[in-house]
């Protein structure tokens, strides 16, 4: 997939600027699980049906959640087989994490555990906002990972939600990103830390 320089543009190609509550989220997981497809479907409403290994790309979108305008900046990271050394940088900077596996490939699910272990080690926090996503449920007949396995793994971590999704059919795509914002806000609320408003360039929908 051809990608731009990471700047956010509206449907007419012009950059928008607005003061919003902003959250920085990293999407992580093995290669070919659909991280880019999930991210682009949410931010641009387009399904990518061709696999093009990502090095790193950033997308932003503004939307209303619980009566509040929020801006989410999403870092679409490389598959874990590429640029593994950069994982720690993503982990240090992001406020929340969407961890994606393919329900069609068991090894991508098992790899999530390694990512989470490294995540907690790098963040040095008891609770890290996480949303676990079993992607490609439009191909459910070929699944290797059951829904219950996904739920059990999510339940083993604090502050973690679980969704099964389809980037192709846009099933639960919005819920995934809404959930991670809610998890981040809950964490700040527990810590008594204010969520700062920043003037950022975001897609105005």
From Swiss-Prot:
Key word NAD present: no
Membrane topology summary: Lipid-anchor
Catalytic activity: GTP + H2O = GDP + phosphate + H(+)
Keyword Hydrolase: yes
Positions of the propeptide segment: 203-205
Lipidation, S-geranylgeranyl cysteine type: 202
EC number: 3.6.5.2
Residue sites binding GTP per the record: 29-36, 76-80, 135-138
PROSITE patterns xref list: RAS
Span of the annotated motif Effector region: 51-59
Top EC class, one word: hydrolase
Residues recorded as bearing Cysteine methyl ester in the entry: 202
GO biological process: negative regulation of cell migration; negative regulation of positive chemotaxis to cAMP; positive regulation of substrate adhesion-dependent cell spreading; signal transduction
One matching Pfam family: Ras
Highest taxon above the source species: Eukaryota
Record's keyword terms, sorted: Cell membrane, GTP-binding, Hydrolase, Lipoprotein, Membrane, Methylation, Nucleotide-binding, Prenylation
GO molecular function, one term: GTPase activity
Subcellular location: Cell membrane
PANTHER family hit by this protein: RAS, DI-RAS, AND RHEB FAMILY MEMBERS OF SMALL GTPASE SUPERFAMILY
Family, similarity comment: Belongs to the small GTPase superfamily. Ras family.
Name used for this protein in its record: Ras-related protein rapB
Species: Dictyostelium discoideum
Lineage: Eukaryota, Amoebozoa, Evosea, Eumycetozoa, Dictyostelia
């Amino acid at each position: 997939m051809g990608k731009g320089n990471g700047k956010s543009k509206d449907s007419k190609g012009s950059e928008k600027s607005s003061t919003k509550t902003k959250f920085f989220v990293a999407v992580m997981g093995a290669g070919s699980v659909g991280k880019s497809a999930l991210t682009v479907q949410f931010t641009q409403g387009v399904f990518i049906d061709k696999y093009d290994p990502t090095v790193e790309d950033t997308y932003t979108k503004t939307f209303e959640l619980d009566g509040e305008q929020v801006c989410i900046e999403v870092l679409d990271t490389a598959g874990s087989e590429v640029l593994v050394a950069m994982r720690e940088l993503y982990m240090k900077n992001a406020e929340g994490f969407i961890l994606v596996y393919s329900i069609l490939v068991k090894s991508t699910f098992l790899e999530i555990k390694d990512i989470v272990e490294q995540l907690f080690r790098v963040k040095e926090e008891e609770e890290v906002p996480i949303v676990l996503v079993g992607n490609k449920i439009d191909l459910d007949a070929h699944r290797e990972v059951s829904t219950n396995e996904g739920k059990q793994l999510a339940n083993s971590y604090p502050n973690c939600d679980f969704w099964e999704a389809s980037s192709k059919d846009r099933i639960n795509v919005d819920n995934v990103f809404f959930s991670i914002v809610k998890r981040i806000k809950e964490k700040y609320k527990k810590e008594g830390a204010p969520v700062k408003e920043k003037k950022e360039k975001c897609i105005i929908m």
